[in-house]
């Protein structure tokens, strides 16, 4: 059978009839199902196939049940790979990108994915960029974007800045190159303004998002409560510190303040700039080395240098040495930490390394450090108190004496969004000597196409006619911003744009009626690797756009599915490992439906999927059997009413299996726990087909296929449409009522035992008498009983029959 031709026929039908476009009827119940948009790399991979197959199954089920479904697709089309391709192949990034989009569109269609074609866009489209640039200006004017110079994560390979979230174990998230530090000007989005709301609203996502994702975001936001206080610089050190009077410190363990034996500050701390002038050459070399290390390198081993200056302990008045340490971070708290070696593993390790004294302040002097809370000693008036009690009393004392205050700190840092590359959305700002930084007024700011990409710096810096412009405010000569936006900005609001993608600027980015109807996204599908990148940014951007008045929404995604990776030979598929399976080859050999069926059957969505050629062939055989048995069906014999009493056991079993599959379908697709165990549903469908294959009763076959094809449509749509059209003119593509009578058990299975040892099973009618059951049991166990003397017959209703023999 030519499965590919059949699939192509229905794909053309769906396209011509715009079968997957949502209706403009706000009274209909809606579902917005969305899979994370792909980067147009050229060809789809099995990870794409799995992601979009899961989403498409949900979409098709809801359409069959009369939901107005929005299921769009787009392309996250800006980014470094296009520039790398330009260097490697001598092709313009725009050409490379849009050719890839066209290719991927064809592959998606060949898989039968039911995307709304009329809502498709690429994030590099000028109309999309225009709104994004307007958002940037609005955020700037609201004070949610600022520009400053800072030490930044720099990828030497991609020659661009990376946000903290884009550095994975010290390496670039995209190309895996070791990240270094570089000082540059950068635009920042003030995501920290939303830290508390982002944390608090995680509670609303419980039971709807995977707990692991919620925990990852909670830890990344990293809320901590503690004491912020000051150490005064010792009088004799003020000159070396250029009259800086004090150093501010944050601690979550105020109860350990009497154990402080040193202060650790980040190499970027303003105190270092002045005090460094008096350190010896070896320590100077160490400090400079720390400054140039990556965040990952700073975690590998503790390093530091004594600055030769002291601070005064606010309670004991003792001198405390000030050290530069690589574990002190400039962007956390004040960039200064109090070192308590007796109560902290990191502080203990550093103190031992540099022979710094250790002061024990807990009742148990053995096995330092004591990281757990204990009863204090050597802690002034707070000695003999439990740590938790002492902590509150010490904070209260500091606040009363105006020595410090209770504060909340967050690990989350503002989002740096400047990128030194060509193929990105231009930042719509003008640098004017007279007016400063001025927003562009003519949007969109588009990229020049006559550029040379050679891998040496940002091409926009070298494009004079684009770079040099006029200030929109004073009309004097000015410079255009040559940095482009981080591509994570594009993916932080695209799901909103899908609601009305054709809106022009004068009508705003979104039609609020459509936005109110379709948002939030009901089910969002993508990899867990996006937990603290895209998913956190999208939540932030939604809240920021709300505060700008564009939308009335707090959270963008109601439910989240994080699908597992596709593995082959136990490892993730990748070209470097040579274990890639080509979707094109699979489609050519087996067809789209077999690939879809295998993907859904091989593992539940959240689990890793191990590629298995024999299981794929099994899916192919199932579809073939479905076609083969359909040839025996005469659809004119189908009547929906059956009298159970007139059916034999095999016929009853066939109906039971079919309606069990229908019932299972509703359970899977409407599962409140969002596990979507499609594998169990497909197993139920296979049992139903096995039962139907034993049948010659055309009415049973007709009813069975009428129901089963509807159940299978979300998973193998081409097959379901072909056979449903052939047999029923697709009359079965509607909600079907479960015939509960078919599910009623009229038989029971009993265990048959002799002297308590299980020997067999017996299936009997549920209303069979004890005498009938014993007679049937004896017959079933005849070979065990023929030479035995039965002493006792025991019948436990609905469970077992036991014969006691001599």
Curated annotation (Swiss-Prot):
It catalyses: tRNA(Leu) + L-leucine + ATP = L-leucyl-tRNA(Leu) + AMP + diphosphate. Its EC number is 6.1.1.4. ATP binds at residue 575. One of its GO terms (biological process) is leucyl-tRNA aminoacylation. Its main location: cytoplasm. The keyword Cytoplasm applies. InterPro entries: aa-tRNA-synth_I_CS, aa-tRNA-synth_Ia, Leu-tRNA-ligase, Leu_tRNA-synth_edit, Methionyl/Leucyl_tRNA_Synth, Rossmann-like_a/b/a_fold, tRNAsynth_Ia_anticodon-bd, Val/Leu/Ile-tRNA-synth_edit. The keyword Nucleotide-binding applies. Gene3D superfamilies: 3.10.20.590, HUPs, Isoleucyl-tRNA Synthetase, Domain 1. It is found in: Cytoplasm. Keywords: Aminoacyl-tRNA synthetase, ATP-binding, Cytoplasm, Ligase, Nucleotide-binding, Protein biosynthesis. GO terms for molecular function: aminoacyl-tRNA deacylase activity; ATP binding; leucine-tRNA ligase activity. A motif ('KMSKS' region) lies at residues 572-576. Transmembrane segments: none annotated. Belongs to the class-I aminoacyl-tRNA synthetase family. This is Leucine--tRNA ligase.
């Amino acid at each position: 059978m030519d499965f590919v031709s059949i699939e192509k026929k229905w794909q053309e039908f769906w396209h011509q009839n715009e079968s997957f476009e949502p209706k403009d009827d706000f009274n209909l119940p809606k579902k917005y199902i969305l899979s994370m948009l792909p980067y147009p790399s050229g060809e789809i991979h099995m990870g794409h196939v799995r992601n979009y197959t899961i989403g498409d199954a949900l979409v098709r089920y809801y359409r069959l049940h009369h939901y107005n479904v929005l299921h769009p697709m787009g392309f996250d089309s800006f980014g470094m790979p296009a520039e790398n391709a330009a260097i490697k192949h001598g092709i313009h990034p725009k050409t490379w990108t849009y050719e890839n989009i066209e290719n991927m569109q064809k592959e998606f269609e060949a898989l039968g994915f039911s995307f709304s074609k009329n809502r498709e866009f690429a994030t590099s489209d000028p109309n999309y960029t225009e709104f994004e640039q307007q958002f940037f200006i609005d955020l700037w004017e609201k004070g949610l974007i600022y520009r400053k110079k800072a030490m930044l994560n720099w990828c030497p390979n991609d020659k661009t800045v990376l946000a903290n979230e884009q550095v994975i174990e010290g390496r670039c998230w995209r190309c895996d190159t070791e990240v270094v530090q570089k000082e540059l000007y950068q635009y920042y989005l003030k995501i920290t303004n939303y830290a508390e709301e982002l944390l608090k609203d995680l509670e609303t996502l419980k039971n709807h998002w995977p707990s692991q994702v919620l925990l990852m975001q909670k830890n990344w936001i990293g809320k901590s409560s503690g004491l912020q206080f000051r150490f005064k610089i010792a009088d004799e050190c003020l000159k070396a510190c250029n009259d800086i009077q004090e150093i501010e410190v944050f601690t979550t363990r105020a109860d350990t303040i009497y154990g402080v034996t040193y202060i650790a500050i980040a190499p970027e701390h303003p105190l270092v700039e002045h005090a460094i002038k008096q350190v010896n050459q070896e320590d100077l070399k160490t400090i400079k080395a720390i400054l140039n290390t990556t965040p990952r390198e700073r975690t590998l081993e503790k390093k530091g240098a004594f600055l030769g200056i002291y601070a005064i302990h606010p309670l004991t008045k003792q001198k405390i040495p000030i050290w530069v340490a690589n574990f002190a971070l400039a962007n956390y708290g004040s960039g200064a930490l109090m070192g308590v070696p007796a109560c902290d593993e990191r502080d203990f390790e550093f103190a031992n390394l540099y022979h710094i004294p250790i002061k024990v302040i807990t009742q148990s002097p053995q096995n330092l450090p004591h990281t757990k809370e204990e009863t204090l000693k050597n802690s002034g008036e707070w000695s003999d108190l439990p740590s938790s009690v002492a902590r509150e009393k010490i904070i209260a004392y500091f606040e009363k004496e105006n020595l410090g205050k209770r504060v909340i700190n967050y690990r989350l840092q503002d989002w740096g969004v400047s990128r030194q590359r060509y193929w990105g959305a231009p930042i719509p700002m003008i640098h004017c000597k007279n007016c400063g930084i001025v927003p562009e007024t003519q949007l969109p700011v588009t990229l020049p196409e006559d550029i040379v990409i050679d891998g040496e710096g940002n091409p926009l810096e070298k494009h004079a006619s684009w770079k040099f412009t006029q200030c929109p405010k004073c009309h004097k000569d000015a410079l255009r911003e040559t940095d482009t936006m981080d591509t994570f900005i594009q993916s932080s609001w695209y799901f909103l744009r899908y609601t009305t993608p054709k809106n022009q600027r004068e009508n705003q980015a979104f039609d609020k009626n459509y936005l109110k109807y379709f948002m939030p996204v009901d089910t969002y599908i993508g990899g867990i690797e996006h937990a603290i990148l895209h998913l956190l940014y999208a939540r932030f951007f939604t809240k920021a756009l709300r505060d700008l008045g564009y939308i009335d929404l707090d959270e963008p995604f109601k439910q989240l599915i994080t699908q597992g990776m596709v593995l082959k030979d136990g490892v993730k598929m990748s070209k470097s490992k040579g274990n890639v399976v080509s979707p094109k080859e699979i489609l050519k050999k087996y067809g789209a439906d077999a690939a879809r069926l295998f993907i859904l059957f091989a593992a539940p969505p959240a689990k890793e999927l191990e590629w298995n050629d024999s299981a794929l062939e099994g899916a192919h055989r199932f579809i073939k059997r479905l076609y083969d048995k359909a040839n025996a069906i005469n659809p004119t014999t189908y009547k929906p009413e059956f009298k159970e009493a007139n059916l034999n056991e095999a016929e009853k079993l066939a109906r039971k299996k079919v309606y069990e599959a229908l019932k299972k379908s509703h359970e899977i697709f409407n599962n409140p726990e969002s596990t979507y165990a499609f594998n169990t549903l497909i197993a139920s469908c296979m049992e139903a087909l096995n039962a139907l294959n034993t049948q010659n009763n055309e009415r049973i076959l007709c009813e069975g296929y009428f129901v089963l094809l509807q159940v299978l449509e979300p998973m193998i749509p081409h097959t379901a449409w072909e056979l449903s059209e052939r047999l029923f003119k697709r009359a079965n593509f509607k909600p079907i009522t479960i015939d509960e009578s078919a599910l009623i058990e009229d038989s029971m299975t009993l265990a048959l035992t002799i002297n308590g040892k299980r020997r067999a099973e017996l299936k009997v009618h549920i209303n069979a008498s004890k005498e009938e059951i014993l007679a049937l049991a004896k017959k079933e166990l005849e070979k065990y009983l023929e030479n035995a003397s039965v002493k006792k017959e025991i019948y436990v209703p609905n469970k077992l029959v036991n014969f006691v023999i001599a």
